[in-house]
From Swiss-Prot:
Its main location: mitochondrion. One of its GO terms (molecular function) is copper ion binding. This is Cytochrome c oxidase subunit 2. Binds a dinuclear copper A center per subunit. It comes from Antilocapra americana. The chain crosses the membrane at residues 15-45, 60-87.
Length: 227
């Protein structure tokens, strides 16, 4: 999860988020090299008196500045497309959870179980216990098994929302009348926090998301106690 004065991303907890972090570093290095080259050329132009006022045609230069950007774009596009296809791929999920956005809370339904559904509201600041996080704790956490593929079906019953958990690399729009889906898989247990990431009204900032990833045995015990 995030911590005060944090500058980087949250720790990756899913294979998709790990890929996104690698892609970020890859793209940032390319941007850094381009920026360094541009700054070097600008400083060279400002500090030297050598100019080419008589140059009317330079096919070699035009060829280079056409081919080089194309190569750079390919180096950025290929890994990006790979991750996009990975995020859309869903192969035989072990569990399906339907998420509905409301003003201003989330409701969850475990479609593989009978009568396993609940609403998830933010715990007001006045009711927080010592050690709990302000504006991030909920009364009902979403308990999921770790190291298993989980399909999230996301929609809304009123306005646009967005179901997002940064450490898992998840951000799926909740649109009324439309069912979007996303896949998540956690590589380790723990609590993972997110928030609605689409402005949805006056209490938009009071729609936290808390996922509790546990071993399969603990998940089965929890689901049996909830049914």
């Amino acid at each position: 999860m995030a911590y005060p004065m944090q500058l980087g991303f949250q720790d990756a907890t899913s294979p998709i988020m790990e890929e996104l972090l690698h892609f970020h570093d890859h793209t940032l290095m390319i941007v850094f090299l381009i920026s360094s080259l541009v700054l070097y050329i600008i400083s060279l132009m400002l500090t030297t008196k050598l100019t080419h006022t008589s140059t009317m045609d330079a096919q070699e230069v035009e060829t280079v500045w056409t081919i080089l950007p194309a190569i750079i774009l390919i180096l950025i596009a290929l890994p990006s497309l790979r991750i996009l296809y990975m995020m859309d791929e869903i192969n035989n999920p072990s569990l399906t959870v339907k998420t509905m956005g409301h003003q201003w809370y989330w409701s969850y339904e475990y479609t593989d179980y009978e009568d396993l559904s609940f609403d998830s509201y933010m715990i007001p600041t006045s009711e927080l216990k010592p050690g709990e996080l302000r504006l991030l704790e909920v009364d009902n956490r979403v308990v999921l098994p770790m190291e298993m593929t989980v399909r999230m079906l996301v929609s809304s019953e009123d306005v646009l929302h967005s179901w997002a958990v940064p450490s898992l690399g998840l951000k799926t729009d909740a649109i009324p009348g439309r069912l979007n889906q996303a896949t998540l898989m956690s590589t380790r247990p723990g609590l993972y926090y997110g928030q609605c990431s689409e402005i949805c009204g006056s209490n938009h900032s009071f729609m936290p998301i808390v996922l509790e990833l546990v071993p399969l045995k603990h998940f089965e015990e929890w689901s049996a106690s909830m049914s």
